[in-house]
C-alpha cells in the first residue's frame, strides 16, 4: 500500500481514511498467526458473541480492548493468535428463529426437529456474516483462518467427550431438582438468563387450621397458587411460640390434605410470623427442607404454566388465573385474613419476558464441589493461578466457588448440543457415549440439549484442537494469555472455563482475566430497549469513525469500572484525531522528499529537539508500562498529552524556526526529528487508532509494508537528555506565563512589550541567554533583558517560575490593586502546595515505604514551592513601597 502521494488530503475524513483498509490488512494476512518458533506465542480467544443479531457497544468495548492487546503484542514481536468465533446461544437463537417462524404462521412442531434445525443454521449463516462485517468496521485484527463456532464438528466432539468423561467419573448425574423454568419457551434457564425485576405484589396472610381443632397457625406467601402443592408447615426449632406444635398437623385449606408441622433451622424466627409453608416441588429452599424431612414433592403445574390435575378444580387454569380464583375461594372460606401490598424481586426470562417458575424437573446436573475445589486450590499457587485485573474480582470469584451449587446443564430445546445419552426402549437402561449405541433402533436419544455455557466453558481449548492434544495449535497456543470480559459473567463463564480447563488440560485456560464493567448512558443508567437509550456502535462509527469510538471506549474508564458513554466525548476524540491529521500534514509538507534511510538523528540538536526526544522516550516508557498493566486509560492519556501538548502545541511551533531559517543542517535535523517522532507516535497510537495511524504512516518515510507489523517503539538512551528537558520546561513556563499575563491585561501577542527576566543564578542565566531566540519568537518583546541582579520595575506584571522571575512593565495597563490581588492568590496557592508536600514528607508511613527517588522528588518540589512563595512575598512587599 506504499503511498506515492506526498501529502495527506487537506481535511480529515474518517470515512475515506477507513474505507478499504481492513480488506487490505486481511489480504496481507497480517492478522494470521504464523507459528514461527523463533517468536513467543501470545493467544487470546474472543468471547464468542451470540449469533442472534447486531453487536452492541459492550461488544465494541470488549473487542477493542482485545484488539489493543493483540496489535501491541504483534508489534512487540510475538506470534499473535487472536481467534474469532461465535456462540450458537441455544435459547436466544431458538427464540429468534421461532419468532420468525411465527410471523409465517408456523411453529417448530409443524416443521419437526430436523427441518427446524435447518432453519436455525440458515439464521446462523446470515447473522454470522453480519457480525464479521461489524468486526471489520471496528477494525479487529482477527485470524479468520481459525474462526470457530460452538456447533462446529470439532467443538461438538469436544463437548461429547467432556460430557462422557464427567459422567464416567460420577460428576454428571440425572435427578429431580428445582430449576428456573420458563413457561413460555418451556425450558430450563441458567441463572444468568433470569432477570430480576422489582414488581408490585402482595403477601397473602392465611390461617392454616390445626387438624385437632385446637386453633390455627398463621403464615404468609407471595405465591398462593403453590399452596396446592404444600406438604408441610415449618417453624424454627428454638421458637418458643411454636415448640408445642411441632409434630402436630394442619389441614391444608381448600385441598383438605393433612400435612405435618416440622422444625427446621431454615426458618427465620424474626421474619413475619416465623412460620413458612413448604412446597418442595415449587421452591428451591423448600426442596432442600423437603429432602431433610423426607417430604413428598407435589408438582401442581404443567410445563406451560397452567395448573395440572394435582391442582384439583383449578386444573387447566393459567397459574395467574388460578391465583385470582384461589384467593377468592380462600377469602370466602375465611382462611385469607389479609392481603398486604409488597414490592419484591421477581425473576423474568431474559428471552421471553415470562415470570420464571421455580419448578421440579428431571434434569442433568454437574456435581460441582470436586471441580470447584481444584479451582480454589489453583488460586493458592502464585505461579500457576489465574490473575484477575483488578485483583478485587478474585475474591468475588472465590466466594462464588466456595458456595457453589450443582449446575443444571440440560435444556428443553432443539438448537444446541444434544445430550449424548440414550434410553433403551424396553429396559430403560441409560447409555452415555461419544458414539450412538450399535443397535440404535432399540434406543431413544435424550431430547434435551446442553446449556450453552457447557460448550462455552470449553472455548479456550476446544477451539485449538482439543481433545487431540497433539494438535499443532493446541500445543503451541494453549494455555491462552488473556481473557477480556465483563464482571457480569465471572460466575457463569469465567469460573466454568477455569474448572473445565483444569479438569481436562491440567492447567489454567488463561493467565490473566481483564475485567471491565458495563456500558451505561451519560446518566449512569444501563442501556436497555425499555429505556430506549441503547446506541448502535455502527452509528457511532458512521458519524465519527472507528478510531474515535475505539479511543474513547478504551480510555474512558479504569479496569473493572463501568463506562458512561458520551457522544460528546467521542466528538472530542474526533477533534483530537483531526489535530493529529493537521500536524501530520505539516510534517509531511516539510519532508522535502526525505527517504526513510535519510532520517538522521546524529546532527547537532537544539534544546527543543533534545526535549521532544526525551519526552518521546518518557511517553514510550509510560505507554508500554501501562499497556503491560492493562491500564489503557493511562496509556491513552500519556499519548494524548504528548501529542496535543508537547508535539503539536510546542515542538511543531518551535520547529518552524529552523525549518524557515537559513541553516540547512538544522533544517535536515529538524526534518529527521519530525519524521522520527511522528513515526514512533503513530506506532504507539496504532493499537488504539489503527486506521488513521496506518494512513499517516504510509505517507511518512517508512520501511515495511504495514504499521500493523512495524516494531513497537523502545526507549533510546542515546536520545535521553534530562538537562535539556529541564531547560525546555523553564522556557515553556516562561512563554506560558507571559501569554497568561498578556491575556489578563488584554494585550495581544502581536503587540511588542518590554520584558525582563531575573535569573536565579548564573546557570539559569546561561540557559536563558542560549535559548533567548525562543523567548523572542514566542513572547514578542520589544526589548528582552536577562540578568541575575534585576530590580523589579514599578507597575510591572510579575510571574514566578522555577529558577526565574518575569517582569512585564505595562504601566499604562496595570491596575495595582488587581495585581496585588492576583499575587495574593498566587501566594495562597503556594501556601497550600507547601503544606501538602510537607504533610506528605512528615508522614512516617510514606517515608518508610516510598522509593528513594519518589521521596527525593517530593523534597525537590518542597524546595521549589518555598522559593516561589518567597519570590511572591517579596514582590508583594515591593508593591507596598
Swiss-Prot record:
Biological processes, Gene Ontology terms = valyl-tRNA aminoacylation
Q: Which Gene Ontology CC terms are recorded? A: cytosol
Positions of short motif 'KMSKS' region: 526-530
| Main location, first listed in the record | cytoplasm
Q: From the UniProt record, list the coiled-coil ranges.
A: 810-881
Q: Which key words are in the record?
A: Aminoacyl-tRNA synthetase, ATP-binding, Coiled coil, Cytoplasm, Ligase, Nucleotide-binding, Protein biosynthesis
Q: Does the keyword ATP-binding apply?
A: yes
Q: HAMAP family under this entry?
A: Val_tRNA_synth_type1
Function in brief: Catalyzes the attachment of valine to tRNA(Val). As ValRS can inadvertently accommodate and process structurally similar amino acids such as threonine, to avoid such errors, it has a 'posttransfer' editing activity that hydrolyzes mischarged Thr-tRNA(Val) in a tRNA-dependent manner.
| Family from the record | Belongs to the class-I aminoacyl-tRNA synthetase family. ValS type 1 subfamily.
| Subunit record text | Monomer.
Entry protein name: Valine--tRNA ligase
Look up and give the organism this protein is from: Bacillus anthracis
Name of encoding gene: valS
Amino acid at each position: 500500500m506504499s503511498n506515492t502521494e506526498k501529502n495527506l488530503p487537506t481535511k480529515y475524513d474518517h470515512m475515506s481514511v477507513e474505507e478499504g483498509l481492513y480488506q487490505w490488512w486481511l489480504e496481507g494476512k497480517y492478522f494470521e498467526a504464523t507459528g514461527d518458533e523463533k517468536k513467543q506465542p501470545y493467544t487470546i480467544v474472543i468471547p464468542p458473541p451470540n449469533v442472534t443479531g447486531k453487536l452492541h457497544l459492550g461488544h465494541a468495548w470488549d473487542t477493542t480492548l482485545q484488539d489493543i492487546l493483540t496489535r501491541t503484542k504483534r508489534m512487540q514481536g510475538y506470534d499473535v493468535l487472536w481467534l474469532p468465533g461465535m456462540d450458537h446461544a441455544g435459547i436466544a437463537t431458538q427464540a429468534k428463529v421461532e419468532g420468525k417462524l411465527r410471523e409465517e404462521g408456523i411453529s417448530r412442531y409443524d416443521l419437526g426437529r430436523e427441518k427446524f434445525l435447518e432453519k436455525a443454521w440458515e439464521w446462523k449463516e446470515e447473522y454470522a456474516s453480519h457480525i464479521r462485517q461489524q468486526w471489520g468496521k471496528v477494525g479487529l485484527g482477527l485470524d479468520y483462518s481459525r474462526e470457530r463456532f460452538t456447533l462446529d464438528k470439532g467443538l461438538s466432539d469436544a463437548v461429547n467427550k467432556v460430557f462422557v468423561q464427567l459422567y464416567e467419573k460420577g460428576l454428571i448425574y440425572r435427578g429431580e431438582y428445582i430449576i428456573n423454568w420458563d413457561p413460555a419457551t418451556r425450558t430450563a434457564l441458567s441463572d444468568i438468563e433470569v432477570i430480576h425485576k422489582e414488581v408490585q405484589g402482595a403477601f397473602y396472610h392465611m390461617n392454616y387450621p390445626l387438624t385437632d381443632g385446637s386453633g390455627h397457625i398463621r403464615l404468609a406467601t407471595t405465591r398462593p397458587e403453590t399452596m396446592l402443592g404444600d406438604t408441610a408447615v415449618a417453624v424454627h426449632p428454638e421458637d418458643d411460640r411454636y415448640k408445642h406444635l411441632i409434630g402436630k398437623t394442619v389441614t391444608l385449606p381448600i385441598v383438605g390434605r393433612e400435612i405435618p408441622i416440622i422444625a427446621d433451622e431454615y426458618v427465620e424466627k424474626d421474619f413475619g410470623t416465623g412460620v413458612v409453608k413448604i412446597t418442595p416441588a415449587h421452591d428451591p429452599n423448600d426442596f432442600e427442607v423437603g429432602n431433610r424431612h423426607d417430604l413428598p414433592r407435589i408438582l401442581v403445574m404443567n410445563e406451560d404454566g397452567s395448573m395440572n390435575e394435582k391442582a384439583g378444580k383449578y386444573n387447566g387454569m393459567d397459574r395467574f388465573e388460578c391465583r385470582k380464583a384461589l384467593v377468592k375461594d380462600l377469602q370466602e372460606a375465611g382462611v385469607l385474613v389479609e392481603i398486604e401490598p409488597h414490592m419484591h424481586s421477581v425473576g423474568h426470562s431474559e428471552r421471553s419476558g415470562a415470570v420464571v417458575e421455580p419448578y421440579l424437573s428431571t434434569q442433568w446436573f454437574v456435581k460441582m464441589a470436586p471441580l470447584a475445589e481444584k479451582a480454589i486450590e489453583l488460586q493458592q499457587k502464585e505461579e500457576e493461578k489465574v490473575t484477575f485485573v483488578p485483583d478485587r474480582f478474585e475474591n468475588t470469584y472465590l466466594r462464588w466457588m466456595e458456595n457453589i451449587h450443582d449446575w443444571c446443564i440440560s435444556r428443553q430445546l432443539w438448537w444446541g448440543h444434544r445430550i449424548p445419552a440414550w434410553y433403551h426402549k424396553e429396559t430403560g437402561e441409560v447409555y452415555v457415549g461419544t458414539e450412538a449405541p450399535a443397535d440404535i433402533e432399540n434406543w431413544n436419544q435424550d431430547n434435551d440439549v446442553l446449556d450453552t455455557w457447557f460448550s462455552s466453558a470449553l472455548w479456550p481449548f476446544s477451539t485449538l484442537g482439543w481433545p487431540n492434544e497433539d494438535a499443532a495449535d493446541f500445543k503451541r497456543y494453549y494455555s491462552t494469555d488473556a481473557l477480556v470480559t465483563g464482571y457480569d459473567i465471572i460466575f457463569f463463564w469465567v469460573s466454568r472455563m477455569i474448572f473445565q480447563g483444569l479438569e481436562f488440560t491440567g492447567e489454567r485456560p488463561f493467565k490473566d482475566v481483564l475485567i471491565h464493567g458495563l456500558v451505561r448512558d451519560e446518566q449512569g443508567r444501563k442501556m436497555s430497549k425499555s429505556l430506549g437509550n441503547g446506541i448502535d456502535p455502527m452509528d457511532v462509527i458512521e458519524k465519527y469513525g472507528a478510531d474515535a469510538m475505539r479511543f474513547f471506549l478504551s480510555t474512558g474508564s479504569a479496569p473493572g469500572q463501568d463506562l458512561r458513554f458520551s457522544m460528546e466525548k467521542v466528538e472530542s476524540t474526533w477533534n483530537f484525531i483531526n489535530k493529529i491529521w493537521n500536524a501530520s500534514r505539516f510534517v509531511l509538507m516539510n519532508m522535502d522528499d526525505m527517504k526513510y534511510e535519510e532520517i538522521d538523528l546524529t546532527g547537532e540538536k537544539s534544546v527543543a529537539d533534545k526535549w521532544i526526544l526525551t519526552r518521546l522516550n518518557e511517553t514510550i516508557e509510560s505507554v508500554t508500562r501501562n499497556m503491560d498493566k492493562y491500564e489503557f486509560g493511562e496509556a491513552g492519556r500519556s499519548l494524548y498529552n504528548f501529542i496535543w501538548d508537547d508535539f503539536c502545541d510546542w515542538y511543531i511551533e518551535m520547529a518552524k524556526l529552523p525549518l524557515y531559517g537559513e541553516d540547512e543542517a538544522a533544517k535536515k535535523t529538524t526534518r529527521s526529528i519530525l519524521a522520527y517522532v511522528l513515526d514512533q507516535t503513530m506506532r504507539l497510537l496504532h493499537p488504539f487508532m489503527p486506521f488513521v495511524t496506518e494512513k499517516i504512516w504510509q505517507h511518512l518515510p517508512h520501511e515495511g509494508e504495514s504499521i500493523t507489523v512495524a516494531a513497537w517503539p523502545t526507549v533510546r538512551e542515546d536520545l535521553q537528555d534530562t538537562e535539556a528537558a529541564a531547560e525546555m520546561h523553564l522556557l515553556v513556563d516562561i512563554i506560558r506565563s507571559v501569554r497568561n499575563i498578556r491575556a489578563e491585561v488584554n494585550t495581544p501577542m502581536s503587540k511588542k512589550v518590554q520584558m525582563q527576566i531575573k535569573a536565579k543564578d548564573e546557570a539559569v542565566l546561561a540557559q536563558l541567554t542560549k535559548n533567548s531566540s525562543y523567548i523572542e519568537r514566542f513572547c514578542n518583546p520589544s526589548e528582552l533583558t536577562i540578568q541575575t541582579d534585576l530590580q523589579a520595575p514599578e507597575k510591572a506584571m510579575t510571574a514566578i517560575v522555577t529558577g526565574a522571575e518575569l517582569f512585564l512593565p505595562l504601566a499604562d495597563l496595570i491596575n495595582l490593586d488587581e495585581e496585588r490581588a492576583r499575587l495574593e492568590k498566587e501566594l495562597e496557592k503556594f501556601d497550600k502546595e507547601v503544606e501538602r508536600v510537607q504533610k506528605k514528607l512528615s508522614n512516617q508511613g510514606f517515608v518508610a515505604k516510598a522509593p528513594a527517588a519518589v521521596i527525593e522528588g517530593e523534597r525537590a518540589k518542597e524546595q521549589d514551592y518555598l522559593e516561589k512563595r518567597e519570590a511572591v512575598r517579596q514582590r508583594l512587599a515591593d508593591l507596598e513601597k
